[in-house]
């Protein structure tokens, strides 16, 4: 008995192990039991993933097997039952309008595509391809966040709790591309915290990693590029002073800003922009939604404040409940959700995770907490503005 208890204790002591165990257990349950294609826009992500699994990168007119196209469309008629019997005839195809998920870069559907490809090797039915795509997405999310928790220096328990929120597992155990987006957000957040808590100079491999992450963020969702904003406030100790940069002309060495820091940040921004432009060139069409030109805020920008009031503040509106509860467990296109009382233990657990701190590891971060907090709040405001005005 003591042997098994010691294993449980060792599991709980390491947040990354606890995350991986719970994520896989509840994720598999969700992947199997949640009705297929019932998750928000899952049928669109299924069409995109299946097309990529067939090796087709299409943008304007897309070709799918008729069985796959019919299965995706049957959701609108209320059919969410899985079909494991009828095999997909890949030669009996239909060409028509592409799914709304086609504008995403292929990296957003890479795990689902691999799962569908493997399913086609065994028994190419719609039921099995959807299930394998879900499981592959879950594995990618769980393993990625596991390594991110291992890697981040501070806030490991916060990463664990947020990564295990019911909505996060629900999306990861589906064909949704939001799992990839969530991994990207976890990654840049961990990278930012590691840099702020680092006492030594920035290493070359970290600079390369930053450039790669910048491109990755842009390819998930373009608005994620705003997550690079807190890096503008990185402490000076990470960078070599201008006077010690031997290859830099003396005129530039007298600049008030750190050349190494701003060269890296400008480079990260250029990589993000280049990644977007390259994908748009490959895709052959605009990546913004078709409704963007008709955005009412373009005609009256002051409506932005009215929308904010009616969304977050006005007590007579029902959106507050959707937003707060939706962040925890509003599932499947808002058709069903967790009971409201679940919010209380969820927020309590998040609070406990915030209190679980290691002062030794946070020592280098402490002088910059105010600066980082301002940067994060500003980033959130930029997100709201970007989504409201551009998307």
Annotated model-derived regions:
Residues 1-3, 191-201, 208, 227-270:
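Perimembrane helix-loop-helix junctions
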Residues 23, 363-391:
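Transmembrane alpha-helix segments characteristic
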Residues 124-127, 146-167:
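Transmembrane-helix signature of polytopic, membrane-embedded enzymes
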Residues 174-181:
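Short acidic/glycine- and proline-prone juxtamembrane loop motifs at membrane-interface regions
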Residues 255-258, 277-359:
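Membrane-lumen/periplasm interface segments of multi-pass, membrane-embedded glycan/lipid transferases
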């Amino acid at each position: 008995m003591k042997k098994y208890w010691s294993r449980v204790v060792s599991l709980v002591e390491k947040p990354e192990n606890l995350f991986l165990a719970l994520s896989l257990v509840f994720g598999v349950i969700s992947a199997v039991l949640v009705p297929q294609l019932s998750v928000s826009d899952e049928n669109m992500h299924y069409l995109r993933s299946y097309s990529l699994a067939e090796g087709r990168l299409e943008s304007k007119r897309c070709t799918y097997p008729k069985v796959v196209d019919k299965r995706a469309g049957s959701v609108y008629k209320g059919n969410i039952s899985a079909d494991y019997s009828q095999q997909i005839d890949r030669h009996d195809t239909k060409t028509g309008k592409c799914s709304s998920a086609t504008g995403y870069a292929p990296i957003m559907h890479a795990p689902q595509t691999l799962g569908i490809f493997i399913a086609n090797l065994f028994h190419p039915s719609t039921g099995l391809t959807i299930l394998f795509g879900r499981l592959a997405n879950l594995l990618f999310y769980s393993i990625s966040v596991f390594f991110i928790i291992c890697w981040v220096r501070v806030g490991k328990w916060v990463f664990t709790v947020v990564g295990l929120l019911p909505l996060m597992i629900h999306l990861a155990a589906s064909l949704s591309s939001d799992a990839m987006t969530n991994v990207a957000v976890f990654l840049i957040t961990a990278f930012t915290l590691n840099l702020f808590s680092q006492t030594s100079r920035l290493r070359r491999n970290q600079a390369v990693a930053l450039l790669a992450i910048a491109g990755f963020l842009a390819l998930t969702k373009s608005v994620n590029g705003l997550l690079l904003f807190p890096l503008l406030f990185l402490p000076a100790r990470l960078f070599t002073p201008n006077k010690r940069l031997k290859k830099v002309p003396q005129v530039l060495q007298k600049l008030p800003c750190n050349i190494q820091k701003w060269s890296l940040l400008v480079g990260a921004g250029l990589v993000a922009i280049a990644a977007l432009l390259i994908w748009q060139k490959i895709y052959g069409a605009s990546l913004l939604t078709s409704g963007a030109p008709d955005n009412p805020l373009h005609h009256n920008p002051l409506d932005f404040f009215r929308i904010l009031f009616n969304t977050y503040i006005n007590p007579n509106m029902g959106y507050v409940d959707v937003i707060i509860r939706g962040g925890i467990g509003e599932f499947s296109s808002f058709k069903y959700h967790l009971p409201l009382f679940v919010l209380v233990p969820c927020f309590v657990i998040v609070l406990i995770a915030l209190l679980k701190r290691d002062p030794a590891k946070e020592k280098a971060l402490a002088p910059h907490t105010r600066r980082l907090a301002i940067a994060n709040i500003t980033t959130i405001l930029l997100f709201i503005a970007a989504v409201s005005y551009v998307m």
